[in-house]
Amino acid sequence: MRVRKPAVAGYFYESGREELLQQIEWAVKHELGPKALQMPKLGGEALGGVAPHAGYMYSGPVAAWLYSALAGYGKPDVFVIVGPNHYGIGAPVAIMKSGAWETPLGRVEVDRELAEVITSHFKEVEDDFYAFSKEHSVEVQVPFIQYYFGDVKIVPIVMWRQTLSTSRELGRAIAKALKEYGRKAYVIASSDFNHYEPHDITTRKDEMAISKILKLDEAGLFEISSKFDISICGIGPIGVLIAAAKELGYINVTLLKHATSGDTSGYKDETVGYASILFYR
């Protein structure tokens, strides 16, 4: 069995099991966190949402909001996690179709069945284990999933080809696959928002981008990000989630929490934006 070993344990999050459990608990209880492990449902069913992927000491409290919200909708069979490929390693759109991912909290198995169905609907996605070797955008979601939901499967996908058309095609393919799969699944778009600008500028730019997401306007998101130089590293995965949501009828989108690294670190001269956003119907 192919096992993807942790690449950023001890860097983005604690490398010891007990320390990591304590770190996630800290994120939940943080003044910027949700305070509770389960939030009341906002609607009948949830598709998933957007979550940040920075170091837990910076973005963990914001990420916890999405997982606490999803916990209110119940445990799924699988998480489809779509993240950016920061390093440009491997295929333009890469999926891991079999094997497992390891974290300090144990192993999670890749859902081969769902991965195969997604691939059948989008021929450009390639089974490429190497593409995930250094990438943290999927990895940092996995301990949160393990903490909140225990033993569930995942389908990891990363993309360095983050065009609007690729995002739409992959999103529609995931939607079709979930219809065929027939079991409970959540889709996570792993993304941070604006990068390395003062807190006030990052906040303003993020709010412009988030307004497009709340309207399910993926084209508008790409347009405004280009026009105002909003450096969203996972704009493609967010586009994937929006396209899937529209295809499946998840037309309600709620911003759960928005903050910057300045809010958690206190250093506001050069910040990164984070948001947890829930998609439901």
Swiss-Prot record:
InterPro entries: MEMO1_fam. It comes from the Archaea. Signal peptide: none annotated. Belongs to the MEMO1 family. This is MEMO1 family protein PAE0818.
